[in-house]
Amino acid sequence: MNALRLIRIMQFADSVLPVGAFSFSNGLESAIQSKIVYDVATLSDFTRTALLQAVSSDGRAVMAACQALNSGQHDAAISHDWAIFNRKLNEESRTMVTRMGKKLAEMAVEVTGESLIAWWLAQIKSDIAAGTYPITLAVVMSALGAAPREVIVMHQYGVAMTILSAAIRLMRVTHIDIQRILFSLNQDIELFCDEAEKGGIEQMTSYAPMTDVLAALHVSAFTRLFSN
């Protein structure tokens, strides 16, 4: 075990990392308003679906970006970044991934001083890169020596915790309920990592009509606790 790498992973996977994730519910708020999610069981199902969709789309791009960065192919990371952005069909998803991505890059370059992260932030500021959160995470953690599968674990954990943290504020669930759901979903992390490694960037799939419908409903909702 590399203790330094492990603690870096823990730091940047922390659900309270100041990148703005708390402002978004990843579709949960609309799902609750639409009566799709209404109890612990449906919350668990909703989160699992989000994890499956994330790993077959963003996860494959993260894996490909990490592999490209480890071989010095920085331009490929930019291409994978736009591949993610272009597959976000709704305004809410695009806003979430780019806002969080830029915040992560800004924070990480100040904290770590890594030249690769500084280069990435410059690409974002000059609009050469979209600066999506998944690829920014790949850049940051590759600069810190994390393996591609470790970055996928971080990405999947972030997806789950964005939804489950929002659930605490939106539903009558306890912290124990949330941890029980998370513990159960984490049993499949090896399968999620294997899925991310399948096919490469050309096999990204972003078909998630319910997510897009919920995002559209959220933008026009009369009351909202979370950002769009």
UniProtKB/Swiss-Prot annotation:
It comes from the Bacteria. InterPro entries: UreF, UreF_sf. The keyword Chaperone applies. It holds the Pfam family UreF. GO terms for molecular function: nickel cation binding. Its main location: cytoplasm. One of its GO terms (cellular component) is cytoplasm. It is found in: Cytoplasm. Keywords: Chaperone, Cytoplasm, Nickel insertion. Belongs to the UreF family. Required for maturation of urease via the functional incorporation of the urease nickel metallocenter. UreD, UreF and UreG form a complex that acts as a GTP-hydrolysis-dependent molecular chaperone, activating the urease apoprotein by helping to assemble the nickel containing metallocenter of UreC. The UreE protein probably delivers the nickel. HAMAP family: UreF (MF_01385). This is Urease accessory protein UreF.
